[in-house]
Amino acid sequence: MKEKMNKIPVFYACDDNFVKYTMVSLQSMMDHASKEAQYEIHVLHTNISEEMQKKMYAMENANFSVQFDHVTEYLHSIQEKLPLRDYYSKTTYFRLFIAEMFPEIDKAIYIDSDTVVLGDFAQLYAYDVGDAFVGACR
């Protein structure tokens, strides 16, 4: 029996209006996931209802865990640094501060909530980005 690999941290950022799309994205990730990997799903948010959180927790399985990270306090601490515009929501900025908010995590994947996953994220996570701070896909 193969031993499962370390957890792969995957981050989403959304609000209560967008969490349903996050759930579709997560389901597509689960549909293509390696059974040998463990995926730790972090949902960065300021206002996801308990009802929607329960629905997303119900998606957990042996390979996927979900945690909701309420980032309102952190957001208030950096708000003066953020140029807010009509076309940028606060959740747009969460991805920029993942490394600062989670210093215990050395490497992670961020995915937009409206992305459909067509391959296994374990392969993407295994890719060596060297000393680069960010790696990106199209």
Could you tell me what each predicted segment is?
Residues 9-11, 40-42, 67-69, 109:
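A structural signal for isolated positions on well-ordered beta-strands in alpha/beta enzyme cores
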Residues 72, 76, 91-138:
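GT-A fold catalytic core of metal-dependent nucleotide-sugar glycosyltransferases
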Residues 33, 60, 128:
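Active-site catalytic pocket residues across diverse enzymes, especially alpha/beta-hydrolases
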Residues 39-47, 136:
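Short internal beta-strands
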Residues 35-40, 105-107:
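Short, surface-exposed connector motifs at secondary-structure boundaries
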